[in-house]
Amino acid sequence: MSENNVIYGINGPVVTIKGETGLSMMEMVYVGEKRLVGEVIRLDKDLTTIQVYEETTGLKPGEPVYATGGAMFATLGPGIIRNIFDGIERPLSAIAEHNGAFISKGCAESALDEEREWQVNMLVKPGDKLKGGDIYGECPETPVVKHKFMVPPGLEGEVVDVKPDGKYKINDTIVTLRDKKGKDHELTLCQRWPIRIPRPVNRRLPAQRPLITGQRVIDTLFPIAKGGAAAIPGGFGTGKTMTQHQLAKWCDADIIIYVGCGERGNEMTQALKEFGEISDPRTGKPLTDRTVLIANTSNMPVAAREASIYTGITLAEYYRDMGYHTAIMADSTSRWAEALREISGRLEEMPADEGFPAYLPSRLSEFYERAGYVKTVSYTHLTLPTN
């Protein structure tokens, strides 16, 4: 792999590198001296194109591009619930404490608090056989959500070492697993997963149970199945966002992932304020104890809107694999499509209807197909995207 990759051209959020780079499609990279987060989106014979998820003002040709060797990922572990992230899973509350109200370029804040300790209860012992999706420990993440630590998909082996119950940080090793080749794998309280790849399931089940939304007009006239997908079309000011807020507050899902993709900042502020004031009718605890917010508002970089949708659905699939019914509200996929249109224009691709890229339908279907009522190793649950 070339160690001398440098910027050749800059066009808004699109950066190009000329010559042999050794980079792979969808590889995560750091661009420029400030190490802006980017992703390889095109590989031509002598030109590599990168989509940058941060503001590129101030970048100049000749600055270095650093390879990571891996895809864009989400960090999955305790501390996700009650948190608010940007489109690439940077914690906005922690950033506000260190950098103020605005995100500085190249901000590398860890998605989860690496110094916080969690009270872990171990569920396995040496000699147990584990495979991907099996649960080896748990901890109370909030008063209403018990976080379950799962073996990453694709990993299988025998437990050779287990730490005792106690308090651990997210990067502490609590279980050592030995695979068939004799290689040891250290399991911690967190794992990483590429946001564009759906987490595997055992099989899909037919959607037969209704999702009770808490809105009688929807439940009566437009019922939604658990594991289904629904869209809320409408013009400006017709109440799409308010309807989604109501669904997020009152639907009978265990976990709510609310993605503000290109929406106004005051709407996300309203959601934050109201969710903290309202009690969950099932538990009596604040709604924030089961909610994750991803805020990629209209004044944030356009390119990060695309990542925010995939980040949200990856977090939802993670909690789904624990056995929770998970509902994800994406507000809105139309602004996500507008972001794709802008990037497509920068790439000088042939436009389709209304200037949108020709691959928009396939991108939309990839997202909505990640919903479903499924069976994993031990559980049956859902993911529900709504626009």
Annotate each language-model stretch with its function.
Residues 1-96, 101-104:
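N-terminal accessory targeting/assembly segments
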Residues 15-17, 50, 59, 112-131, ...:
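Short beta-strand segments of a lipoyl-like beta-sandwich/carrier module
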Residues 66, 70-73, 86-91, 95, ...:
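Interdomain "pre-motor" coupling segment immediately N-terminal to P-loop NTPase/helicase cores
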Residues 98-120, 138, 149-150, 171-172, ...:
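P-loop NTPase nucleotide-binding/switch module
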Residues 239-255, 260-261, 265-266, 274-275, ...:
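Conserved P-loop NTPase nucleotide-binding/switch module
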Residues 265-315, 350:
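Nucleotide-state-sensitive switch-loop elements of NTP-binding domains
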Residues 379-386:
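Conserved small/polar residues in nucleotide/adenosyl-binding loops
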